[in-house]
């Protein structure tokens, strides 16, 4: 990876807004260049220039031109494929169609010549759904040249000519039209030629006068099907699109007077034609188009057939109609006869005109629209139903005499109805008598008519119910809409409130200054947004003198921030130099192996359990049989499932290691010996797991021992808040024997189940900057600094630059726990990395960096912050403090230099030594380091009067000779509790001894002798003990001490003696004191020094 890279300062989303191009298009273009992008990706100036060149206006025009040209060629090819096979078929059928045209014209004229007899009534096709009167809507003639018509359109138009009147015309396929890619003229001419051959034009000119239009509208009320020249019910809708794409429908309705077999056949053929593929539509259309102008039956036959059908219906309805209404029916029939006559005249005119049009041989294949007429638009009256049509027929065929008898009845009924029904709406004259007749017929005929009326009432009730439901639904919709409006208002107010809160939070956050402790004046000024001069002036006003590069303490930073109206939030060096990274993409996230930490008290079998799982013997390699290092191991099961295990020490001195293990793990296995109790380190491990919110699986070990009691362990765990599943809790528990392997496989299965529930995922993208944690670090003589890293996200390869705490470097090699070289490491995999410039601390974050320069900058900044922190917090001895300590003689200090094999061991030793010190004796670690003891360490110990503790390390040859010369005490240890014991004893020896007073003799004064030149001599008797000549004594009178001193002389008889035992008499004098009396007591005593014990609080 190059050391220098061009700075990325242009976001893709900003470039997309600038060019007015979709962000996805920009991303796809950049990815084609070989870059991996997201919505927040930044690019360099060179990449931005490439994007601008690609999406410039000239580039857009050229791309659009290419796209239009490709679309044009594609459509031309598609049209050629469609037209070529159809043209061959139509050319073959053209000759056959012309031959049949002459014969069909003759037949059509022969069948259309007979006119309708005057004496015959209008033919009526009685049907449940009466047909609409003949109506032809023709769109206005378009003078523009016809658009190219595809073969499918020709077939579709031909098919429309033979469909029944009430059936909608088959949809026509719009011609292929694209403003961007026009067809060449040669292709258009060929398409038009084929279309003209396949669909000859039929010219229809209808120009009815306004009076005729009104007659047609009036005829709709009593519409009756009439004879037709055609044998089919035809309905055609033709759409012609102009350049403006405006389409107007052309509809032709022709009433049908019969239902012939040809009509059924044509309808079936039309249905089949719609289901067939487009390639077969044109052939089917030609077959259907041919019989269009042929009329198989004459109008007279149609009328005869309609009359017979009419008589049958009339006989059925005549039985249920009242005879007393005949007169009213006759009056209404006169109006119907007039309307029928006008309707028949119009129909005859249209039939003659249509037959003339079909007489031309060129019109035999279809229709062509030349214009459109607009009929008089007004509200049409209601169509008569089947019963009303039957009533009209009966009135026409009923004799006149019954009609005259019933005339008075008709005159009286309207008068009776007008009074109660004055406020009601007026009904049609033909509909109301029928309803009255039905009501009266129900009363006269009884149940027979009631049966027919019930469905009518049920329909009415249904309509009412439907109207009620619609009204209720409308009301509900209104209520729902009002409720939705209220909800929208509430939601809007909530959004506004949230926006106000966010704005306030942002404003408050903008006034919070996040800074590290011991920042320089220049750095503080940059974060405050002011010049360093202003900061220095503020400090001058506050009475402090600082420089621009001076490091400021915590109090000064807080004071200056308040002066500039800022709040201060102090952060660590790692947070200050945190590296921003792109968010993880869902496609990059994959399931990762779980990380399992084994925790528990010392000697409960943690490492033995791991040895059984790994099929190794780690315990044999540990000094004293206890774990003193934090190990990371990867285990592969039989099903290729991978697990990562972290083995933590159980000794109380390794608290930091256990806390570190709980923070980076996914699952904790808590090992408790069944033959022991829940120990303090067990409780500590549980607290670490709870603090890290990590699930716990309890493993009760050593169940193979005779004195094992798993139930006692469960009880003790429940007392401290860990309730296992067997007792109704949520913590899994498994009884195992790490020595024999009993239950170990079940324990692993429970770990896998717990990991599956956690849904552990990590980013496996190679573009992701990897992250990890330093588990342990050591200094090897041949390899240099080696750190054990647990990868958390991303993929690590050899040669990548990195930073870990205050150390940086480039990966030179990667090793697994067995020393095998690795080229690539994935998430949740432990690895030993070589290439650190300095020794990192256990627990530091390991981060892959884009370049060596960035890694070095971050590492140097962290080192400055840490050095300043150590310097400011180092203990400084003042002269007054030294004088006070000398006067009191209480405080003793043991200076220590610690050298160990790993950084974790150093931390454990330092923490352990801090715990054994007291207020009178203290331990000061003046230097700590990883690696062997060097000459520098010896010189430092000689200058500071310190001892050197080597934990699993040895001095080099020169250091050993220098230590012997300077008489420096170097202690070597391999087990941590041996170090702590010796330091404990040394601190006890440094304690001042405890002084205790012991009474050696009690002497009673019985007589006093006065001797010249000597003074008063006391004659005494030794009551208890033995009084010595050198003993200190005190004189007690009535229990009150009046003198304390030494003896001046001690004699027995006349001889000087050194001591007098109990029960003997003696004489004594007190030095410089003569005020003695009879019965005074003299006590001799001595002070005894007692060695003190070091009591650690």
UniProtKB/Swiss-Prot annotation:
<dbReference type="InterPro" id="IPR009000">
    <property type="entry name" value="Transl_B-barrel_sf"/>
</dbReference>
<feature type="region of interest" description="G2">
    <location>
        <begin position="625"/>
        <end position="629"/>
    </location>
</feature>
<feature type="region of interest" description="Disordered">
    <location>
        <begin position="79"/>
        <end position="458"/>
    </location>
</feature>
<dbReference type="InterPro" id="IPR000178">
    <property type="entry name" value="TF_IF2_bacterial-like"/>
</dbReference>
<dbReference type="Pfam" id="PF00009">
    <property type="entry name" value="GTP_EFTU"/>
</dbReference>
<feature type="compositionally biased region" description="Basic residues">
    <location>
        <begin position="376"/>
        <end position="385"/>
    </location>
</feature>
<keyword id="KW-0648">Protein biosynthesis</keyword>
<comment type="similarity">
    <text>Belongs to the TRAFAC class translation factor GTPase superfamily. Classic translation factor GTPase family. IF-2 subfamily.</text>
</comment>
<feature type="region of interest" description="G4">
    <location>
        <begin position="701"/>
        <end position="704"/>
    </location>
</feature>
<feature type="region of interest" description="G5">
    <location>
        <begin position="737"/>
        <end position="739"/>
    </location>
</feature>
<dbReference type="InterPro" id="IPR023115">
    <property type="entry name" value="TIF_IF2_dom3"/>
</dbReference>
<keyword id="KW-0547">Nucleotide-binding</keyword>
<dbReference type="GO" id="GO:0005525">
    <property type="term" value="F:GTP binding"/>
</dbReference>
<dbReference type="InterPro" id="IPR015760">
    <property type="entry name" value="TIF_IF2"/>
</dbReference>
<feature type="compositionally biased region" description="Basic and acidic residues">
    <location>
        <begin position="174"/>
        <end position="190"/>
    </location>
</feature>
<feature type="binding site">
    <location>
        <begin position="701"/>
        <end position="704"/>
    </location>
    <ligand>
        <name>GTP</name>
    </ligand>
</feature>
<dbReference type="InterPro" id="IPR005225">
    <property type="entry name" value="Small_GTP-bd"/>
</dbReference>
<feature type="binding site">
    <location>
        <begin position="600"/>
        <end position="607"/>
    </location>
    <ligand>
        <name>GTP</name>
    </ligand>
</feature>
<feature type="compositionally biased region" description="Low complexity">
    <location>
        <begin position="157"/>
        <end position="173"/>
    </location>
</feature>
<feature type="region of interest" description="G1">
    <location>
        <begin position="600"/>
        <end position="607"/>
    </location>
</feature>
<dbReference type="GO" id="GO:0005737">
    <property type="term" value="C:cytoplasm"/>
</dbReference>
<keyword id="KW-0963">Cytoplasm</keyword>
<feature type="compositionally biased region" description="Basic and acidic residues">
    <location>
        <begin position="268"/>
        <end position="286"/>
    </location>
</feature>
<dbReference type="GO" id="GO:0003924">
    <property type="term" value="F:GTPase activity"/>
</dbReference>
<keyword id="KW-0396">Initiation factor</keyword>
<keyword id="KW-0342">GTP-binding</keyword>
<dbReference type="Pfam" id="PF11987">
    <property type="entry name" value="IF-2"/>
</dbReference>
<feature type="domain" description="tr-type G">
    <location>
        <begin position="591"/>
        <end position="761"/>
    </location>
</feature>
<dbReference type="InterPro" id="IPR053905">
    <property type="entry name" value="EF-G-like_DII"/>
</dbReference>
<feature type="compositionally biased region" description="Polar residues">
    <location>
        <begin position="258"/>
        <end position="267"/>
    </location>
</feature>
<dbReference type="InterPro" id="IPR036925">
    <property type="entry name" value="TIF_IF2_dom3_sf"/>
</dbReference>
<protein>
    <recommendedName>
        <fullName>Translation initiation factor IF-2</fullName>
    </recommendedName>
</protein>
<feature type="compositionally biased region" description="Low complexity">
    <location>
        <begin position="224"/>
        <end position="236"/>
    </location>
</feature>
<dbReference type="InterPro" id="IPR027417">
    <property type="entry name" value="P-loop_NTPase"/>
</dbReference>
<feature type="binding site">
    <location>
        <begin position="647"/>
        <end position="651"/>
    </location>
    <ligand>
        <name>GTP</name>
    </ligand>
</feature>
<dbReference type="InterPro" id="IPR000795">
    <property type="entry name" value="T_Tr_GTP-bd_dom"/>
</dbReference>
<dbReference type="Pfam" id="PF22042">
    <property type="entry name" value="EF-G_D2"/>
</dbReference>
<dbReference type="Pfam" id="PF04760">
    <property type="entry name" value="IF2_N"/>
</dbReference>
<feature type="compositionally biased region" description="Basic and acidic residues">
    <location>
        <begin position="202"/>
        <end position="221"/>
    </location>
</feature>
<feature type="compositionally biased region" description="Basic and acidic residues">
    <location>
        <begin position="402"/>
        <end position="443"/>
    </location>
</feature>
<feature type="region of interest" description="G3">
    <location>
        <begin position="647"/>
        <end position="650"/>
    </location>
</feature>
<comment type="function">
    <text>One of the essential components for the initiation of protein synthesis. Protects formylmethionyl-tRNA from spontaneous hydrolysis and promotes its binding to the 30S ribosomal subunits. Also involved in the hydrolysis of GTP during the formation of the 70S ribosomal complex.</text>
</comment>
């Amino acid at each position: 990876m190059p050391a220098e890279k061009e700075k990325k300062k242009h976001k893709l989303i900003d470039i997309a807004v600038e060019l007015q191009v979709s962000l996805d298009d920009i991303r796809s273009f950049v990815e084609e260049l070989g870059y991996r992008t997201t919505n927040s990706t930044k690019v360099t100036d060179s990449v931005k220039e490439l994007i601008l060149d690609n999406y410039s206006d000239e580039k857009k025009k050229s791309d659009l031109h290419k796209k239009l040209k490709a679309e044009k060629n594609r459509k031309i090819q598609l049209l050629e494929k469609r037209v070529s096979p159809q043209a061959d078929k139509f050319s073959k059928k053209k000759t056959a169609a012309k031959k049949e045209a002459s014969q069909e014209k003759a037949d059509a004229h022969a069948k259309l010549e007979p006119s309708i007899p005057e004496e015959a009534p209008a033919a009526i096709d009685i049907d449940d759904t009466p047909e609409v009167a003949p109506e032809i809507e023709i769109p206005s003639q378009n003078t523009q040249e016809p658009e190219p018509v595809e073969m499918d359109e020709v077939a579709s138009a031909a098919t429309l000519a033979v469909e029944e009147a009430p059936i909608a015309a088959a949809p026509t396929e719009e011609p292929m039209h694209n403003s961007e890619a026009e067809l060449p003229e040669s292709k258009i001419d060929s398409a038009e030629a084929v279309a003209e051959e396949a669909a000859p034009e039929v010219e229809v000119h209808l120009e009815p006068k306004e009076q005729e239009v009104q007659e047609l509208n009036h005829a709709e009320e009593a519409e009756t099907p009439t004879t037709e020249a055609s044998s089919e019910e035809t309905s055609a809708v033709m759409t012609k699109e102009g350049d403006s794409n405006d389409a107007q429908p052309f509809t032709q309705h022709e009433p049908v007077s019969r239902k012939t077999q040809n009509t059924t056949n044509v309808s079936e053929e039309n249905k089949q034609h719609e289901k067939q593929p487009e390639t077969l539509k044109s052939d089917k259309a030609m077959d259907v188009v041919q019989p269009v102008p042929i009329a198989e039956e004459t109008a007279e036959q149609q009328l005869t057939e309609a009359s017979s059908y009419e008589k049958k219906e009339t006989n059925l309805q005549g039985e249920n109609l009242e005879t007393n209404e005949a007169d009213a029916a006759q009056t209404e029939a006169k109006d119907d006869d007039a309307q029928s006559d006008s309707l028949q005249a119009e129909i005859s005119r249209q039939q003659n005109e249509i037959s003339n049009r079909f007489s031309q041989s060129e019109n035999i294949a279809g229709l062509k629209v030349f214009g459109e007429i607009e009929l008089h638009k007004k509200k049409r009256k209601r169509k008569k139903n089947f019963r009303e049509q039957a009533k009209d027929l009966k009135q026409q065929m009923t004799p006149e005499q019954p009609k005259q008898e019933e005339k008075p009845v008709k005159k009286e009924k309207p008068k009776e109805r007008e009074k109660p029904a004055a406020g009601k709406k007026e009904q049609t004259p033909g509909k109301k008598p029928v309803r009255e007749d039905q009501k009266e017929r129900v009363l006269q005929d009884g149940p027979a008519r009631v049966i027919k009326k019930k469905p009518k009432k049920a329909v009415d009730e249904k309509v009412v119910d439907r109207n009620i439901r619609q009204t209720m639904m409308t009301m509900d919709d209104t209520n729902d809409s009002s409720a939705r409006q209220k909800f929208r208002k509430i939601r809007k107010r909530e959004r506004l409130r949230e926006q106000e809160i966010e704005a306030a939070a942002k404003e408050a956050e903008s006034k919070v200054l996040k800074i590290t402790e011991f920042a320089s004046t220049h750095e503080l000024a940059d974060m405050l947004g002011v010049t360093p001069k202003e900061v220095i002036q503020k400090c001058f006003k506050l009475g402090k003198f600082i420089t621009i590069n001076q490091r400021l303490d915590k109090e000064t930073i807080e004071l200056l921030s308040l002066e500039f109206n800022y709040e201060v939030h102090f952060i660590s060096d790692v947070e200050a130099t945190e590296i921003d990274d792109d968010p993880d993409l869902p496609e990059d996230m994959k399931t990762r192996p779980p990380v399992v930490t084994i925790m528990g008290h010392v000697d409960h079998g943690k490492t033995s359990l791991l040895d059984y799982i790994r099929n190794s013997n780690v315990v044999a390699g540990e000094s004293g049989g206890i774990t003193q290092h934090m190990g990371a191991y990867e285990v592969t099961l039989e099903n290729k499932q991978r697990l990562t295990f972290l083995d933590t020490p159980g000794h109380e001195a390794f608290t930091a290691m256990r806390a570190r293990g709980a923070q980076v793990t996914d699952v904790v296995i808590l090992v408790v010996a069944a033959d022991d109790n829940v120990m303090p380190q067990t409780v500590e491990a549980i607290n670490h797991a709870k603090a890290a919110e990590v699930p716990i699986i309890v493993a009760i070990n050593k169940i193979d021992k005779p004195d094992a009691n798993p139930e006692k362990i469960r009880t003790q765990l429940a007392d401290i808040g860990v309730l296992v599943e067997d007792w109704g809790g949520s913590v899994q528990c498994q009884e195992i024997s790490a020595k024999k392997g009993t239950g170990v496989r079940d324990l692993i299965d429970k770990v896998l189940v717990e990991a599956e529930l956690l849904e552990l995922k990590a980013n496996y993208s190679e573009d992701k900057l990897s992250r990890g944690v330093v588990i342990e670090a050591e200094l090897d003589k041949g390899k240099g600094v080696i750190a054990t890293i647990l990868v958390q996200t991303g993929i690590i390869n050899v040669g990548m630059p990195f930073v870990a705490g205050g150390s940086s470097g480039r990966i030179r090699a990667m090793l697994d726990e067995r020393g095998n070289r690795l080229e690539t490491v994935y998430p949740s995999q432990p690895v030993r990395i070589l290439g650190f410039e300095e020794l990192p601390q256990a627990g530091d974050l390991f981060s892959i960096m884009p370049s060596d320069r960035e890694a070095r900058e971050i590492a140097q900044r962290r080192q400055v912050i840490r050095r300043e922190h150590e310097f400011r917090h180092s203990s400084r001895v003042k002269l007054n403090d030294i004088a006070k300590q000398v006067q009191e003689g209480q405080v003793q200090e043991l200076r220590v230099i610690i050298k160990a094999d790993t950084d974790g061991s150093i931390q454990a030793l330092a923490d352990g030594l801090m715990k054994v010190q007291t207020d009178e004796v203290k331990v000061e670690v003046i230097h700590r380091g990883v690696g062997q003891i060097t000459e520098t360490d010896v010189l430092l110990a000689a200058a500071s009067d310190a001892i050197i503790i080597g934990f699993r390390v040895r001095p080099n040859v020169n250091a050993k000779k220098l230590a012997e010369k300077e008489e420096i005490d170097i202690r070597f240890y391999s087990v941590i509790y041996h170090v702590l014991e010796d330091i404990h004893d040394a601190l006890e020896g440094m304690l001042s001894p405890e002084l205790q007073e012991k009474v050696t003799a009690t002497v009673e004064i019985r007589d006093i002798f006065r001797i010249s030149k000597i003074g008063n001599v006391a004659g005494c008797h030794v009551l208890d003990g033995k009084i010595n000549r050198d003993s200190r004594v005190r004189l007690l009178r009535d229990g009150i001490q009046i003198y304390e001193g030494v003896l001046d002389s001690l004699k027995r008889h006349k001889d000087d003696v050194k001591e007098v035992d109990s029960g003997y008499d003696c004489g004594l004098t007190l030095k410089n004191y003569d005020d003695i009396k009879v019965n005074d007591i003299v006590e001799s005593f001595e002070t005894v020094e007692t060695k003190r014990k070091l009591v650690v609080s």
